[in-house]
Curated annotation (Swiss-Prot):
Part of the 50S ribosomal subunit. PROSITE patterns: RIBOSOMAL_L24 (PS01108). It comes from the Bacteria. Keywords: Ribonucleoprotein, Ribosomal protein, RNA-binding, rRNA-binding. HAMAP family: Ribosomal_uL24_B (MF_01326_B). One of two assembly initiator proteins, it binds directly to the 5'-end of the 23S rRNA, where it nucleates assembly of the 50S subunit. InterPro entries: KOW, Rib_uL2_dom2, Ribosomal_uL24, Ribosomal_uL24_CS, Ribosomal_uL24_KOW, Translation_prot_SH3-like_sf. One of its GO terms (cellular component) is ribonucleoprotein complex. The lineage of its organism: Bacteria, Bacillati, Actinomycetota, Actinomycetes, Bifidobacteriales. Belongs to the universal ribosomal protein uL24 family. This is Large ribosomal subunit protein uL24. GO terms for biological process: translation.
Length: 111
């Protein structure tokens, strides 16, 4: 199965307190959550460690569920759904079927 959202994708938040913000996906977690750059910022209290790190309040990005974001179409710059197209490619003298992610609005392949 091909993942609909991968790290490095440009996404837009469609629900929640950060609605309308755009960011790049840093990590995709196993429980259908994403860490998006600049979105879902929370304050975290950090203890001092023995290595000299200071105690204090740090801003970090919290995970957001994948149903609350949409991938931005590279051609139209609008949020779009993601589809999967099966293509046949010749690699090393053999024909292999490959699943490719495609933006539904423009039909353009996603990287």
């Amino acid at each position: 199965m091909v993942a609909k959202i991968k790290s490095g994708d440009l996404v837009k938040v469609i629900r929640g307190k950060d609605r309308g913000k755009e960011g790049t996906v840093k990590r995709v977690l196993k429980d259908d959550r994403l860490i998006v750059e600049g979105v879902q910022i929370v304050k975290k209290h950090v203890r001092a460690t023995q290595q000299g790190q200071q105690a204090g309040i740090v801003s970090v990005e919290a995970p957001i569920h994948r149903s609350n974001v949409m991938v931005i179409d590279p051609e139209t710059k609008q949020p779009t759904r993601v589809g999967v197209v099966i293509k046949e490619e010749a690699r090393d003298g053999k024909v292999k079927t490959v699943r490719v992610r495609v933006a539904k609005k423009s039909g353009k392949e996603l990287a």
